[in-house]
Amino acid sequence: MPRVKRGVQARARHKKVLKQAKGYYGARSRVYRVAFQAVTKAGQYAYRDRRNKKRQFRQLWIARINAASRQNGLSYSRFINGLKKASIEIDRKILADIAVFDKAAFAVLVEKAKASL
């Protein structure tokens, strides 16, 4: 059985990890063993937070819609219920955008929701 030397592969693997760790503080960007742990943990955080981002944006949209609809005299849940009954299908992202940037149009939506309750 011939001897297998894996220096080239190991060097390439180490370079890849250290490249990913570029910009990290101290040994995390220089020492392979520490950098590997840091990069692995960063990947776990990234995976988790890609999912959390969707939840957080939905929470933000709901908070904005709730604030704007209460300014027009209607709670969030009654507003959404009114829109569903009026068969107005606008998602929360767009509703939040309208609430922030076009208050007059949002007021019209609130009136339509009130009318359909």
Curated annotation (Swiss-Prot):
Offer a single GO CC term for the protein: ribosome
> Which Pfam family, any one, appears in the UniProt record?
Ribosomal_L20
GO MF term list: rRNA binding; structural constituent of ribosome
Q: Which Gene3D superfamilies match?
A: 6.10.160.10, Ribosomal protein L20 (1.10.1900.20)
User: Keywords on this record?
Assistant: Ribonucleoprotein, Ribosomal protein, RNA-binding, rRNA-binding
Record GO biological process: ribosomal large subunit assembly; translation
Q: Which NCBIfam families does the entry link to?
A: rplT_bact (TIGR01032)
* Role, per record: Binds directly to 23S ribosomal RNA and is necessary for the in vitro assembly process of the 50S ribosomal subunit. It is not involved in the protein synthesizing functions of that subunit.
Family in the record: Belongs to the bacterial ribosomal protein bL20 family.
**What is the designated name of this protein?**
Large ribosomal subunit protein bL20
- Source organism per entry reads Vibrio atlanticus (strain LGP32) (Vibrio splendidus (strain Mel32))
